[in-house]
């Protein structure tokens, strides 16, 4: 089963989760320090103990500096950090 761990369960994190599901990720779970629901399996600092169970992860915070900070942490720990781009996304030829 293709699974993904997302750090950040706010609005941006939920959008990333929907996109990940469109890409074929069957199990998507979150780490978040503030949001509490059934999809949130712990706090952000728990990323260190979740690596074996979820080797693929992304940081999905709206704040760019926070997203970069956590992406660096994930990479240092050895996580695979994929680009999550919706399959229907289109890039302009003039971009």
Residue ranges of each PLM-predicted region?
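Hydrophobic, well-ordered beta-alpha structural blocks that scaffold small-molecule cofactor pockets
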Residues: 1-51
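Phosphate-bearing ligand-interacting subdomains
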Residues: 35-91
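Short, intrinsically disordered, charge-balanced linker/junction segments flanking boundaries
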Residues: 93-95
């Amino acid at each position: 089963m293709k699974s993904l761990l997302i750090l950040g369960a706010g609005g941006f994190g939920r959008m990333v989760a929907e996109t990940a599901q469109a890409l074929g990720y069957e199990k998507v779970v979150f780490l978040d320090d503030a949001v509490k629901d059934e999809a949130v399996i712990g706090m952000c600092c728990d990323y260190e103990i979740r690596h074996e169970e979820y080797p693929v992860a992304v940081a999905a915070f709206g704040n760019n500096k926070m997203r970069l900070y956590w992406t660096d942490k994930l990479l240092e720990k050895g996580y695979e950090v994929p680009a999550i781009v919706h399959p229907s996304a289109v890039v302009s030829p003039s971009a």
